[in-house]
Amino acid sequence: MKIGDKLSNRFGGKGVVSEIIPDNRMIQDENKKPIDVLFTSAGIVSRINPGQVVEAALGKVAEKIGKPIVVPQFQNENNVEFAKRLMKEHGVKDKETVHDPVSGKDIPNVFVGRSFIHKLFKSTETNYSARGVSGYDVNLQPTKGGDEGAKGLGRMEVNALLAHNARNVLKEALTLKSEKSDDFWRAYEFGLPAPPPKTPFVTEKFMAMLQGAGINVNKEGAHVSLGPLTDRATSNLSAGALSTPSLDKSKSFMVNAKNLAPETGGLFDPNLTGGMSGKKWSHIDLTEPIVNPVFEDAVRRLLDMSKKQLKDEIGTSGGTGIRKQLNKLDLDQLAVALREQTRTKRGSDLDGVVKKLKYIEGLKKNGFSKAGDAYIISKIPVIPPVMRPIVQSSRGNDLQISDINYLYRDVGLASAALQNSKETEMPGVISDARKYLHDAVGSLFGTQKATTPGRANREIKGFIEQITGSGSPKTGFLHKKILRRQQDLTGRATATPDNTLDIDQIGVPEDMLWTTYDKFIMRGLIGLGYRPLDAKKMVEDRHPAANSVLQHEITYRPMFVNRAPSLHRHNIVAAYPVPVQGKSLRVNPFMETGQNLDYDGDAMQLHVPVTMAAVQEAQNLTMSKLLFGDKHAADLMVFPKHEAILGAYLATKVDAGAVHKFKTQAEAMQAYQRGDIKMTTPVEIEEAHGAV
């Protein structure tokens, strides 16, 4: 059993262990036996659940008579009356005068009983994790899972930080803390000027995925606009055309099966793509033009075709014929006619006219005078290999190949098949080959399901399906990698109450502090003149000099405390860490309101700011500086509850009589614990300059 482990009875009463006390210091019953578990009585009232009290009372009766008790159901006598009757028959009391061996005081009228209590699987160990700077996935983002898994900042946390106007915190969270940043940390440890943050790899990959799906991305300052990707734009991106893959299945379009060397002219050709980790774009030349699958709806609306009619047209005249039809349209004249129709059309007809007009306006905004030049393509962009890697599995006997590589291969094979079909001079065969090529490109772009079967019972997904997710947006690249960023320098643990902490403090496991403050300790030691290797060894050994640096860091570098879901800005605040033992977080109960926190196993995340600008923002986001909520001026986010209200009430009551004098506050507390004075006894503390 550890502090933070979760306990529950059979009636919904649950909570975490906040303190573990030795038997010789634990409250004792009337038989001088230490009590196993102490519960607050507030839980019974708040849950309106007397069943747990009845069980505990009857448990004492069962213990005395030596046999189980069956509580009758659906009788005139209720359970409380039944329990009282049995207790009276067997001479069992529900309340006892318990003894505190520490103070020597007897405490009367305390409910004591026998209850079935079990420890839940969700424990301190399962909730605990602490991460410094290490371990990244293929997208260069901090890896998740395990004791060192990264914790994320999602859209709700970003909104909370925006509400705080914590711009520097957001800046580092979305750049250096959410991506492998070796150059930054190397400079930081040596106290050198930090290099400017780069565009994160996941952002570049996201843009590349859009372009890979046939969508052009135009950036003008802070504005981004999307439109059709043309052959000219693809040529500008590309370092050259890849070879058409052979229809002979023994020849790979990726790597050699025997030695894993990249195939010449293939998807990992060193000259065209830069090799297995290359950063060069390339492209595939199609046998003949096709309709860009992303803009099929635009094409069929401009040509007044149904989906079936467009599909048939793709098979008969192909992209070349459809381009001619599109280029015959006078976009300006058509736009004028459509605007006139918006005045008379209604319902679905009006909806169709408006969509058609929007497509025309979009073309003109992107500089197209001919629709065919925008929507018909004959070059397929191939994103750099670093964004579609082939990596060896951890077992070493298999290759993990990015889905997109299979789909590129399928496009190449479909293009080769169309070329071969033309040699047959059979219209039906050629039509089927054209449709197959269109479907292959659609699978690659992600507008339809892949024609290639998945591996290991997993579907292969194209670009758009990868971006948006299948089934739920939460599974997509946009949500998992762009809107939510895993972070370095994070921790997570179960929250337990600790009223000894200051309102701006949080008790953090010492092991977690050594992990999350590792880089700051290294910087401090190197600044004191220690060599980097020696400094690293000192941190690992927790040398006194390293501990001194850690203690200095936590005095001015607070941690961000976050309890998900972040419904408002008070769900993410800052607090100064206080080292504690164990693997649970200690929280001042006054923090509960803003964090939507209770103590039934709730876990909280911690994030450490890096740059001084972010540290200064964190210092201004402590609870003492965020006293008031967002609703109105009297909406306190720091408000006493339960025992704190009782304490505040008793603090206003002062007994009449002589003032008791003590040298220190600790001495007065010892006298209270011995029972020499009461909470309402007036005292004079010498160290407080005679304050009463």
Can you say where each PLM-predicted feature lies in the sequence?
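Short beta-strand-centered aromatic/proline hotspots
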Residues: 16-20
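Conserved core architecture of multi-subunit DNA-directed RNA polymerases
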Residues: 8-9, 13-14, 33-38, 47, ...
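P-loop NTPase nucleotide-binding/switch module
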Residues: 1
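Short, conserved beta-turn/loop elements at beta-strand boundaries and strand-helix junctions
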Residues: 21-26
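Gly/Ser-enriched beta-turn/beta-hairpin loop segments
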Residues: 29-31
